[in-house]
């Protein structure tokens, strides 16, 4: 008996977990992305909506561009790249695991901000993966929690990704006297009235969700302000008016969406080098 098609991506991932599937789920849409599974666990997610592990490591300066390129040349299989980085003492195993796992959760959150169009399965593609990976149910639950928290603190999370915060004139020192945490200062220094939260996340190599929370905190401290225009619920936004879908579950897809056409895969870890300076 053939099982009925999954109604959305979370349901699909649960089924693939039961099957112990190793491969890639390509999700179409904006931003869309590729979900890399190993034995049914989510090892990595690559999406234009959130910084990758590569971006996080390089933009932060944790690993230099030159060292990264040399590591990619020495170990071209991205699945084994993490082990190579640890073996060469370029990063600790625990630290790498934290970075990889955090990137999985952040990418799932970023993909959930807009309704996906459909999905298709493909063979395993090399990726810098978290070991052993994240349980799909845990990923869905955490994404739902993040969406709910942002909705309560600010409003529709999808709207927040498109606003362009600006610093408040005469707001005082930017933490030079120690009253503002370093991570908040970094976010504040990246606010210029042109960058969206996503732009800031890529500029800093930090998770989109964390940046959005920090921006809300900055607004509460009257250090930033949103565009004068507002959304229907009173929140400011420069975003074009587009229908908002129910995004309380991770990476949702319509029940009867047609499968998208195949498109080339995402960038390899080495291809992310040089992208870290974009965003404003």
Map each language-model feature to its residues:
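Acidic, Ser/Thr/Pro-enriched low-complexity segments and adjacent helix/loop capping patches
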Residues: 1-280
């Amino acid at each position: 008996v053939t099982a009925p098609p999954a109604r959305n991506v979370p349901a699909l991932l649960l089924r693939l977990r039961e099957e112990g599937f190793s491969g890639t789920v390509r999700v179409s849409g904006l931003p869309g992305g590729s979900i890399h599974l190993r034995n049914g666990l989510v090892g990595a997610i690559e999406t234009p909506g959130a910084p990758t592990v590569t971006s996080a490591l390089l933009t932060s300066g944790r690993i230099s561009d030159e060292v990264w390129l040399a590591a990619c040349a020495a170990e071209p299989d991205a699945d084994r790249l993490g082990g190579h980085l640890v073996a060469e003492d370029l990063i600790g195993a625990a630290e790498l695991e934290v970075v990889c796992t955090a990137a999985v959760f952040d990418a799932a959150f970023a993909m959930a901000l807009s309704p996906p169009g459909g999905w298709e399965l493909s063979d395993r593609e090399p990726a810098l993966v978290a070991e052993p990976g994240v349980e799909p149910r845990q990923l869905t639950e955490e994404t739902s929690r993040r969406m709910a928290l942002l909705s309560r603190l600010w409003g529709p999370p999808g709207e927040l990704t498109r606003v362009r915060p600006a610093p408040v004139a005469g707001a005082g020192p930017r933490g030079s006297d120690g009253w503002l945490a370093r991570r908040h200062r970094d976010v504040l220094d990246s606010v210029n009235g042109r960058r969206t939260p996503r732009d800031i996340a890529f500029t800093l190599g930090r998770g989109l969700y964390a940046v959005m929370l920090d921006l809300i905190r900055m607004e509460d401290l009257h250090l930033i302000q949103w565009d004068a225009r507002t959304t229907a619920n009173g929140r400011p936004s420069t975003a074009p008016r587009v229908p908002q879908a129910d995004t309380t579950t991770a990476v949702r897809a319509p029940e009867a969406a047609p499968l998208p056409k195949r498109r080339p895969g995402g960038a390899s870890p080495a291809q992310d080098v040089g992208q870290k300076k974009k965003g404003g």
